[in-house]
Amino acid sequence: MGSTEDELRAMARDLQLPRFLGTFDKSFPGFLQESQRCCAIVNTAARHTGGRHWLAVAWEPASRTFYFFDPFGFSDRELAQVYDFEYQRLLRKSAIQSTPDRCLTLVKSTQSVQGPHSAACGLFCLLFLAAFARYPDSPMAYNPVMDLVEGVDNERLFDADVQPIFRANQEACYAFLARHSAYFRAHRHAIMEQTHLHKALDMQ
């Protein structure tokens, strides 16, 4: 269910992400070079489990900003409760937290752009990292890439009246990747089948 590591890496190459370090499981070692802009896609589970949920992280050294993007916009408590995942571990393992002053800005997504039963988390991570590549000072919002999707307060994730927003977001994400990724275009039907809006329900 969802996107494989090979798929995400192939689409990331098409998007020409700056210093994309790759895809990782929850043991991601963090950003080891504080002076270079870089980004990665990280799963909340160990690799041997097959994975659960994709997140994106990015580091902008000019402003010393660490970006943490979760397509569901879960709070720290929810991430720990639902996935047993704490992004603080990423910071502690990163060189950006090992510098003498340890001074940085953390910017974390707080709204949901992905529907509750969608398996497109990896694709939304690519969308965010494409925004980071183009607009590293404001990748979360107020740029032409992330403005393609609309955020919803996380506590409304399951509300019926916001589900059309999630459908439109997923279609916008597919359309963006179709424009910018040859790999997505070549494998569109398989990718969409494995990530569609109700994929999680199919697995129950």
Swiss-Prot record:
The record marks 50-51 as: Cleavage. It catalyses: Cleaves proteins of the adenovirus and its host cell at two consensus sites: -Yaa-Xaa-Gly-Gly-|-Xaa- and -Yaa-Xaa-Gly-Xaa-|-Gly- (in which Yaa is Met, Ile or Leu, and Xaa is any amino acid). Keywords: Autocatalytic cleavage, Disulfide bond, DNA-binding, Host nucleus, Hydrolase, Late protein, Protease, Thiol protease, Virion. InterPro entries: Papain-like_cys_pep_sf (IPR038765), Peptidase_C5 (IPR000855). Its EC number is 3.4.22.39. It is found in: Virion; Host nucleus. It is an enzyme of class 3 (hydrolase). All late proteins expressed from the major late promoter are produced by alternative splicing and alternative polyadenylation of the same gene giving rise to non-overlapping ORFs. A leader sequence is present in the N-terminus of all these mRNAs and is recognized by the viral shutoff protein to provide expression although conventional translation via ribosome scanning from the cap has been shut off in the host cell. Belongs to the peptidase C5 family. Interacts with protease cofactor pVI-C; this interaction is necessary for protease activation. This is Protease.
